[in-house]
């Protein structure tokens, strides 16, 4: 979980564009971010496993 101060810091408008950091919309995690979904890999796995993301299925071959 991201700290409250880190989340508040990222909400403020940044002076430079390179300082912007993508964060998970659900938990605020800065790493393992999937742009297509806007969430981190851990939250993506949880939601996909529960069938809450349309079109995402467990692979099997």
From Swiss-Prot:
InterPro entries for the chain: Ribosomal_uS14, Ribosomal_uS14_bact, Ribosomal_uS14_CS, Ribosomal_uS14_sf
Which cofactors does this gene product need?
Zn(2+)
Q: Which Pfam families match?
A: Ribosomal_S14 (PF00253)
Any note on cofactor binding?
A: Binds 1 zinc ion per subunit.
Task: Choose any GO biological process term that the UniProt entry carries and state it.
Answer: translation
**Superkingdom of this entry's organism?**
Bacteria
Query: One GO cellular component from the entry?
Result: cytoplasm
Is this entry keyworded Nucleotide-binding? no
Q: Which GO terms describe its molecular function?
A: rRNA binding; structural constituent of ribosome; zinc ion binding
Residues holding Zn(2+): 24, 27, 40, 43
Its keywords, alphabetically, are: Metal-binding, Ribonucleoprotein, Ribosomal protein, RNA-binding, rRNA-binding, Zinc
What does this protein do, in the record's words?
Binds 16S rRNA, required for the assembly of 30S particles and may also be responsible for determining the conformation of the 16S rRNA at the A site.
Q: How does it assemble?
A: Part of the 30S ribosomal subunit. Contacts proteins S3 and S10.
The cross-references to NCBIfam families, in alphabetical order and at most eight, read: PRK08061.1
Family to which this protein belongs: Belongs to the universal ribosomal protein uS14 family. Zinc-binding uS14 subfamily.
Protein name per the record: Small ribosomal subunit protein uS14
Q: Its encoding gene is what? A: rpsZ
